[in-house]
Design a protein with these regions (language model features):
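N-terminal acidic leader/helix
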Residues: 4-35
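Short, flexible helical or helix-coil boundary motifs
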Residues: 21, 25, 68-71, 75, ...
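Compositionally biased, intrinsically disordered low-complexity segments
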Residues: 28-30, 50-52, 80, 88
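Amphipathic alpha-helical packing elements
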Residues: 35-79
Length: 94
């Protein structure tokens, strides 16, 4: 089993996003992407991240928190998922 957090992590921007927007956070598979993290308001994605090789869930959540800070501060939308799906579809099949 993976090692538990040795220190408490805070995700202030995730907390603020959930409280202020009544949005949702999802972590999971979006085929063909094995691991992704999404923050959305209704059907409107605000942040979508692709899990990196060997990235832990806490590390992915930390990146989500940072990206949500940018969204909260300036409305910056981050989308790693759609470009990655397009890239994989365009790649030659083995």
């Amino acid at each position: 089993m993976a090692k538990l957090f040795s220190r408490a992590a805070t995700f202030d921007h995730i907390q603020a996003f959930l409280e202020d927007t009544h949005g949702q956070i999802t972590i999971g598979e979006i085929p063909p992407i094995r691991r992704a993290a999404l923050a959305a308001q209704g059907k409107n994605p605000r942040v979508s991240l692709v899990g990196r090789p060997n990235e832990t869930v806490p590390e992915l959540l930390q990146r989500l928190d940072v990206a949500l800070a940018a969204f909260i501060a300036s409305g910056t939308i981050t989308d790693e998922v759609l470009p990655e799906i397009k890239r994989r579809r365009a790649a030659p099949q083995k």
